[in-house]
Structure formats: C-alpha cells, structure tokens
A protein has these predicted regions:
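Long, charge-rich, low-complexity alpha-helical segments
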Residues: 116-166, 211-215, 223, 228-231, ...
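S-adenosylmethionine
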Residues: 195-204, 216, 248-417, 432
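Conserved SAM-binding motif I beta-strand of class I
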Residues: 242-247
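Flexible, glycine-/basic-rich loop-and-beta segments that form/coincide
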Residues: 387, 394-477
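Short, positively charged and aromatic/hydrophobic N-terminal segments
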Residues: 17, 26-32, 46
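SAM-dependent Rossmann-like transferase core, predominantly class I methyltransferases
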Residues: 156-222, 227-239
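Acidic, low-complexity/disordered tracts enriched in E/D and polar residues
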Residues: 38-120, 190, 445-541, 585, ...
C-alpha cells in the first residue's frame, strides 16, 4: 500500500511540474485534474490496482478512455443498429457467429470509417475478435496505451502482433436515457476453457431481472449485496443518496470501482468525493454491514446450489455463483438475516433458488413448492412475497450450471460433476429446484404489534410477464397496505375502478344464453388471469369509480336475492358458512391486491396493474 501511495504522490507532483509552465487556463484545468486524481485515489484505494482486474488508479486515464469510447459512438443503440436484430438476439443467447459474420460483412462493404471502427470495437470487446496492430491503432489511436495500462487489452498470447480484449466492456442503457460502460470478465463464449473460479459476472439475464423488479422510489441509504461488476449499484445511484456495495471477491470490487469512476459523470458521482455517494466493502453476505440499517437492499446472491466436497477451499469455488453452503442455505440465510439490516418498513429485492422436496407418500410428486420459503419467514421477522418463475429437475439444473461455467468442455470432469449434483440432490430427497423473485420488508411498528396483518404471498407465475415489473409490484404493495388498514365497513365506503389494462373475456357454448366462464386479464405487469364468479363478474362490471363498494354490493344482494346480512350471525358462522357478502368482499380484496381493481383516488395511470417505466434494459 505504501508503494502505491508513493507512486500516486510522485505521479501527481510530476504532472504539476510539467504543467506549471503552461498558460493560466491549462494550470487551472490541471490543478482540478490533480485534485480529482488525489480524491479518486482515496476512494477504496485497495481495489484500484488488483491483479487481473481493470486498473482505476488514474482518473485522468479513465477520462481519456471514456472520451475515446464516446468518440467511437460505442453506445447501446449504435451497437444494436450496426449488428441488426438477428445478430443482436444471437448475442443475447451467447452465440457470437452471427455477430462475427455481420462484422466481417461491414468491414468488407462500403461502410464509413466510423462504422467500421465501431464494428471492430464491438467485435473486439463483445465477440472476442482480436485486432491487428494496424486495426488497434485505427480504433484506439493515441489512447491505446491507456487501454493497455488500464488492463482492458493485452497482447494476444498466440500472436504478439495482435491485441486481445482482457475484459468484456459494453455499453449499458437505462430507459431514462442514462448510458454507461460496464466492464466484466470475458464470458464462456468469449474465452477458451472453464471460467476462472473468481470470475466476475457481467450484465446477464439474472442481473437484468433483478434491476427490473427493484423498486425505484427515492431512498437515503441502499445496499447492494454481492455487487459483482456493480450493475445494481449503478441503477441504485439514480434514486439512492448513498449506496454501499459489498462482495466477497476482491476482483469484483476492483471491477466495480473501475466502472464507477469510468462513469462518474453519468452516475452523478463527484470524482473529488466519490465516498459521498458510494462505499465498497469486502466480506461475505451481510458481515461487512453488521449493525447498519438501510432503506433498500438488493441482492443477486451466489445462490446456485452446488455439491459440497469435503475439504474444499473457497479458492476452489465459483465465487460469483456459489456461496459455499449446502443446498439452498445461502438463500434461506439471506432471507432470515436481511431484516436485521433494514429500517422498519425498509424493503429488499433479491433472486434465489429453493429446493422442492419429494412427497413422502408419492416420490414422483413434489411437496408444495413454497413449503421451504414459508418456513424461512414463519417467525414474522419479514413480510414476504415470493414469485416462483420456473422449476427444474436435478438433472436439468446440473446441466444448466455445468454449461454456465463451461465445465462441459472436459467430458470426464463434466460427467463426474454431473453425478455429484445428482447425488447431492438425492441426499436431501429433492424433487426439483425452484427459481424466482423475492420481495421482503421489515415490519413497521404497527405491523409488528399486530395492528395490521403482515403481507405474506407466495405465487407461481411461469408464463411470460411484462418487464420491468417494479412499479406494478410497488402498486400492489401500496394497495395491500391500504386494504390491511381497512375493515369491511371502511371497504364498503371505498370507490374502486377497473385498471386501464384489464379486459374481460366470456366463454360459452354456441347459442348459450349465458357464458359458462368469465375471465379478467391484465395486459401488462404480471399479466394475471382471474376466473370470476357471477358475483365478482357483476361487481367488476359496475366498478367505474362512481359507485361505492357498498352500493354495488347492495345492488348485487337485491339482484341475486341474498339473505339479509346479520353481522352477529355472520360472526357466529365463522368461516364454515360465509354469507355471500363476506365471500364477495374477500374476492374484492384479492382483485385489488392483484391490481385488477384500483382505488379511484389513485393518481391516474400511476400504478396500473402492469404500468411500469423501464428501469433498465441491456
């Protein structure tokens, strides 16, 4: 560390002497750059020059790199347009051949010099196409040495006359127009052999899913657990005053530091004081922030279930996906412990896996998928909403993750590890493995005291949904909170209306006087479908915001000849024989929670059943 500081001090004083003889304007600009350089150096300096990771120990160098990328028009839209739909979609599947074919077509065709250089650049960083000496000079110009010194590019190991990318460096765009550059390790489709154990994951389907489910309401303090290349932190900075990013990997924090400083201007980070908005900490799960409280926590934890090996060390594990614990314990640990770092009412969004156990009486059948997740929150320490998106058999799960790290390239190793996966799942009687989205909230004082019922929801939604769904989920939670504070009398006085994206479907036999099936469909968000009874169909049809719930219920009671409602008698009957009014009000609450119905005083369109402004795209 002393050597690093000395080098910084020496570099700064040398720069100042060189520019001390310049014009006054040059001197002012250089003093500002020196100040920024010193300040950037004091920001998590231990991650500025980590081996085999991008170097962020020279802010002036990062500025020149960013300016070169911008000059080359290296943007999300430009890359998509140059590649075309087919090649871009193939890249999303980690297939590089269509992209390489497209690039060669551009280089041979009548395209402009700028388009050809953009093609070379994207092929270099995204498709693992090396550059010749002449091409590198054309693409990088006088910043070639900056890219090399920042450990972004290197001489090709097989041919020193060529250059290869050391990292995957790509543009990433948010729907609000924000665009940044994100560096991560080269993926399995960009490099030979098995991934390195301390691989730093880039922008993938899981990270984008998490970004799309994360609530974007303004908060003071946010926490990103398992930051990786920093992608969640970058999105959090748009609505959090300060973000703490943690990871067990020193290399991951080095990538995050590099990306933060490379994009400091776009992310509204002052290079003279980065610590004002971001802090980086190394450690496992919540250990680095023990005793602290946050308004919002996001995490794409290393949740991949991996067979444990006796005597294995952390260096032998794929740290980007393997938390080192057996089964789904990494996710259960996170779910149980997250409330301890949340303020009352604070929320967390994360992704996870959970094991679904075989039924003891029918080994071919599973027990309920939510059995284990329910147990994790049974103590009431957190309100919870689990949405299972898919479930894989042990064999399919093993194949997915063996391929993910390119462990299928060595046949002997592949078969041996495949068997280990099957043995591991069999040892716990696992039928399948669920994957999905997790929303958590630390109960408020009122909820903890029992004044309102805690939100506990477990849904399986395996059909396509309209991402991003963050605002749809937020709207549902707000409606739940409002409903939870209402008894039936308050609900009867409320005005409801059908959400704008909801349509009704009626099905019946040809010639039949009445439909046999009536459905409501949400056209966005979670895209739910709800089967309606005659009563709920009638209620939905009359819910235009003008009539109170009680008025509609009274009209239905008369139309359907319900017996007179006696509150004392209803209480005596309990749940064994509910009055039609109670049944209907329960169904109405469910329609509101599922966002088919809205409170009529909600801001128009602000919280539709699926309305969601795109939080991220990539």
């Amino acid at each position: 560390m002393t050597v690093l500081v000395s080098r910084w001090v020496g570099a700064v004083s040398l720069r100042y002497r060189l520019y001390a003889v310049g014009a006054p304007g040059q001197m002012r600009r250089m003093r500002r750059m020196v100040c920024m350089t010193i300040s950037a150096a004091s920001f998590a300096p231990e991650y500025a020059a980590v081996a085999d990771a991008p170097r962020s120990d020279d802010y002036a160098r990062l500025t020149r790199i960013r300016e070169r990328l911008l000059a080359l028009n290296y943007s999300y839209d430009a890359v998509q347009e140059l590649l075309g739909v087919e090649a871009a979609e193939a890249m999303a599947r980690d297939q590089v051949v269509p992209g390489l074919w497209r690039v060669e077509h551009i280089l041979r065709g009548g395209y402009s010099a700028g388009e050809k250089n953009l093609a070379r650049l994207l092929a270099f960083f995204l498709l693992a196409r090396p550059l010749t000496e002449a091409e590198a000079a054309e693409v990088f110009g006088d910043t070639l040495v900056d890219f090399e010194n920042a450990a972004l590019i290197e001489r090709d190991a097989a041919d020193s006359a060529r250059w290869s990318a050391s990292v995957d460096l790509r543009p990433h765009a948010a729907d609000d127009g924000t665009e940044i550059f994100v560096a991560a390790d080269l993926g399995a489709h960009q490099r030979p052999g098995v991934l390195r154990k301390n691989h730093v994951l880039g922008i993938g389907h899981a990270s984008l899913t998490l970004a799309q489910i994360t609530e974007r309401t303004p908060v003071k303090r946010a926490l990103d657990v398992g930051t990786g290349c920093g992608i969640q932190t970058f999105h959090l900075l748009a609505h959090a005053e300060h973000v703490t990013a943690t990871d067990i990997s020193e290399r991951a924090l080095a990538f995050t530091r590099f990306n933060l400083l490379l994009n400091a201007q776009t992310l509204n980070i002052d290079p003279q004081n980065p610590q004002a908005r971001v802090s980086l900490r190394m450690g496992s799960l919540l250990e680095p922030v023990a005793g602290e409280l946050f308004d919002l926590v996001v995490s794409n934890p290393p949740f991949v279930i991996t067979p444990r090996v006796a005597g294995e060390s952390a260096e032998e594990q794929f740290t980007y996906r393997d938390g080192g614990l057996p089964g789904d314990e990494i996710v259960s640990t996170m779910v149980r412990q997250l409330p301890s770092v949340l303020v009352p009412g604070g929320r967390a969004q994360m992704l996870g896996n959970w094991e679904i156990i075989r039924d003891s009486e029918d080994l071919e059948a599973p027990r309920p998928w939510d059995e284990r997740p329910r147990a994790w929150v049974a103590d009431g320490g957190a309100e919870a909403w689990f949405i299972q998106r898919e479930a894989l058999t042990p064999a399919s799960y093993a194949e997915t993750w063996l391929k993910d790290a390119s462990e299928n390239r060595d046949r002997s190793h592949y078969e041996q590890t495949y068997v280990a996966y099957l043995n591991d799942f069999a040892s716990r009687n696992v039928h399948s493995i669920g994957f999905g989205m997790i929303w958590l909230r630390r109960p408020t004082e009122a909820t903890a005291a029992g004044a309102t019922d805690p939100l506990q929801r477990f849904e399986e939604i395996t059909y396509p949904i309209q991402q991003p769904i963050a605002r749809a989920l937020t709207g549902s939670v707000r409606r739940y909170d409002r409903l939870a504070a209402m008894d039936d009398e308050a609900l009867l006085a409320t005005h409801l209306e059908v959400a704008e994206d909801v349509t009704e479907e009626r099905h019946g036999r040809p010639g039949a006087e009445h439909p046999s099936v009536i459905l409501l469909r949400a056209g966005s968000g979670l895209c739910r479908t709800q089967l309606l009874s005659t009563e709920t169909a009638g209620f939905a049809s009359a819910s235009d915001g003008e009539l109170a719930v009680g008025q509609i219920v009274a009209a239905l009671a008369m139309l359907l000849s319900w017996p007179e409602y006696d509150e004392a008698a209803a209480a005596a009957r309990g749940t064994q024989e509910q009055h039609p009014r109670d049944t209907l009000l329960h169904a109405v609450r469910e329609l509101v929670l599922k966002s088919f119905l809205h409170f009529s005083d909600e801001h128009a369109g602000a919280e539709s059943a699926g309305e969601s402004t795109a939080e991220a795209q990539g």
